[in-house]
């Protein structure tokens, strides 16, 4: 049975529809950075997706090739994730002006993936997929203390969920803790190409700290 992060780490991938506080452990990702409206056909975001999945599936399918990865176990490729920000000191996201988005689009990798394994996967995927994988990176993220919530509905309706998260943490004595490395985080549990907008499920996560 392939290891499924969504099922084994439910506190990270299946939070309640009401806000909750969680301490997120360090993780590794295959990631691509970019800018612009994620809905733009042929834009940086759309072009990043085949690169991410190309690396993730190359690692997963290494069991059938010549590469022997130490500590390997079969796994279900985790859901697509994204870290988003705009040039705003507060860390607030303006969903109207999507052209101003900066993003790190990413997919979680198992902890057994080393730098050497990652570099091998990049070279292997580039050979097989005939794509330019120079934009991908092995990203280490340590989110730590966060508030999160399951958002159901269109992405543009996320501000209501974010407001509920902020109200919840304020009542408990926490404040937002955005920085260059602590960002608005989304985990996409639904495929927008196959799911009605009102049924989309997205984990929304924000960094927090104790109020001084």
Give residue spans per PLM region.
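A solvent-exposed interaction/effector surface
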Residues: 1-212
């Amino acid at each position: 049975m392939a290891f499924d992060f969504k099922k084994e780490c439910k506190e990270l991938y299946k939070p309640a529809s009401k806000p909750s506080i969680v301490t997120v452990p360090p993780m590794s990702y295959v990631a691509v950075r970019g800018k612009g409206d994620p809905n733009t056909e042929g834009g940086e975001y759309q072009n990043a997706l085949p690169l991410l999945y190309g690396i993730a599936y190359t690692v997963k399918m290494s069991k059938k090739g010549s590469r022997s990865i130490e500590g390997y176990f079969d796994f279900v490729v985790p859901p697509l994730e994204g870290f988003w920000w705009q040039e705003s000191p507060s860390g607030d996201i303006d969903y109207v002006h999507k052209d101003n988005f900066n993003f790190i689009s990413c997919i979680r990798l198992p902890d057994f993936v080393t730098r050497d394994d990652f570099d091998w996967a990049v070279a292997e995927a580039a050979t097989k997929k005939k794509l330019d994988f120079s934009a991908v990176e092995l990203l280490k993220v340590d989110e730590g203390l966060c508030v999160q919530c399951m958002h159901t509905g269109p992405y543009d309706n996320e501000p209501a969920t974010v407001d509920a998260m902020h109200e919840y943490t304020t009542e408990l004595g926490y404040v937002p803790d955005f920085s260059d490395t602590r960002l608005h985080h989304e985990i996409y549990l639904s495929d927008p190409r196959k799911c009605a907008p009102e049924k989309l499920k997205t984990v929304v996560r924000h960094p927090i700290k104790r109020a001084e």
